[in-house]
């Protein structure tokens, strides 16, 4: 039977991608349905109990700047917060938080259940309703049909998921959850390229059986950072320490002696695993010269005895897992309460997607998260927000939106996926962004919140907070520009005491702040330049904008040159066989990728500058040279 109500957008899957997608579509005013196999696992952290990190924290800040959920949920659930790369430049500084699994899930579910325009329904989806190459709904396991104008697939590792522990394996979406077999089979019938990937998780350890006195504690930062631009440290629950131990030669010997029982090394697992989060058996074999590997023992929550040993993801048999754990200092008597495992699952080639994450072949069908070949909660959540936004726009017959590479790490993410695809689980790093000085954590709201407001994602509270912050920054910078001191000023000795060389000519506050020996706090402590801003976010922004102004200006000039290519559009249905002068290799690659712009085409491996020139000349001759606004 058909459900009586029609929806604008259906989201299939309630993980990090699905929850952000559902919230985004609903915030835009679209009637949204979130279909999940289990309401109790909405927003579940399936692997490590942490949010953020290098590149990943940048994505979380961008999600927050666009009105998303992840940063706010982390502030309510975070039990340890740290700024990584704190001693380095602002472009690569990143926030990371340990999170209480239960509190995180509760924060996500509470937000979903209180979001207007959003309905949640518990049923596993087994089929899509596709008519004339357009998706129009979904069918659940009991035959209930839901109709919608757009559908977003955020099914994680559930598509034909297979769990491996040693040489044994069984079907599963993750430990304790069933796989999605019927939906996987249905999607394989569509004109989409599909492949297999693999990821893994470590065994969980009972904290009561660990001798923490032998371990090095790792504490969070003080003052405690926050993730959301609207957050404050008072929202955080009780803070906890992590601890550090190490593998050793005994650990490595256990692993080497049992490689024949590893499903990876026995050839049972076909999917490729994440390069930057390898299993412990992979680390031991790939880095044979290393005598030890650092392992972080991370608490799973305030009310749990479970410890997540970050660094020993494994699919070796349980008896070998026990030997590995007990070979390490402080864990000699440790008990495992959940075995580690590897999971293989279907993913769909993201080159078959537009930068909006809509399928090039099935109208109204959007993909987000691990189904696109990514790994990580943050990458999934960012894609989910974008897919939910664009599904909402599609349902309202509006053009899709996606950020450019110079506007957001989210732009880098979707451009990499839709242009280059991936053969291994893709994770974000700051090194993937060529304009990372512009794409800092601290300015994510300045880059994206105004756009989010225009798109209908940003509510009045966030907009008022943002507008006040922008005004504060502008006024403070103008104030510093207006205050001048000269070598004979009354208070010049106070300033000279901070400088390597005495002031030799007149200077204003911004010029003094550009000097490496002076920061904003020091400058505003001087009689002439006080008082300082009380909002630390605004104060940091003033300092960064002033100190890095020259570098930022140069990078902006580079971006403007590149934008000419980015804004030159390519027809979606163009057959590149028509373009005389292109080599067969270039024609094949362009027809395979179907790039949406000259800029995107130029980033495809093997597409030369000469080929781009030929293409531009041909477009002009044919009267097809169009540029986006």
From Swiss-Prot:
Record-listed FAD binding positions: 13-18, 125, 180, 370
Lineage start: Bacteria, Pseudomonadati, Pseudomonadota, Gammaproteobacteria, Enterobacterales
Function: NAD-binding protein involved in the addition of a carboxymethylaminomethyl (cmnm) group at the wobble position (U34) of certain tRNAs, forming tRNA-cmnm(5)s(2)U34.
GO biological process, one term: tRNA wobble uridine modification
Annotated protein name in UniProt: tRNA uridine 5-carboxymethylaminomethyl modification enzyme MnmG
Cofactor(s) listed in the protein's UniProt record: FAD
GO annotation, cellular component aspect: cytosol
Pfam families per record: GIDA, GIDA_C_1st, SAM_GIDA_C
Protein family: Belongs to the MnmG family.
Any GO molecular function: flavin adenine dinucleotide binding
Quaternary assembly: Homodimer. Heterotetramer of two MnmE and two MnmG subunits.
InterPro entries: FAD/NAD-bd_sf (IPR036188), GIDA_C_N (IPR049312), MnmG (IPR004416), MnmG-rel (IPR002218), MnmG-rel_CS (IPR020595), MnmG_C (IPR026904), MnmG_C_subdom (IPR047001), MnmG_C_subdom_sf (IPR044920)
Subcellular location: Cytoplasm
Coiled coil: none
Annotated binding of NAD(+), by residue: 273-287
Keywords of this entry: Cytoplasm, FAD, Flavoprotein, NAD, tRNA processing
